[in-house]
Amino acid sequence: KVHGSLARAGKVRGQTPKVAKQEKKKKKTGRAKRRMQYNRRFVNVVPTFGKKKGPNANS
């Protein structure tokens, strides 16, 4: 029923080195955020052939 014993719970998270949070610029909210989304998705799109690349593609 369970994949692996509960003794292994949180193994990977425990192993990863702690990285301190960075200070970042505040995100836009409401209308301004939607405007940014719209621009990102529909306005400055690069015409490509074949399969569409996802928003998180790294190539």
Curated annotation (Swiss-Prot):
Residues 1-35 are annotated as: Disordered. GO terms for molecular function: protein tag activity; structural constituent of ribosome; ubiquitin protein ligase binding. It holds the Pfam family Ribosomal_S30. Residues 23-35 have a biased composition (Basic residues). Transmembrane segments: none annotated. Keywords: Ribonucleoprotein, Ribosomal protein. This ribosomal protein is synthesized as a C-terminal extension protein (CEP) of a ubiquitin-like protein. This is Small ribosomal subunit protein eS30. The gene is Fau.
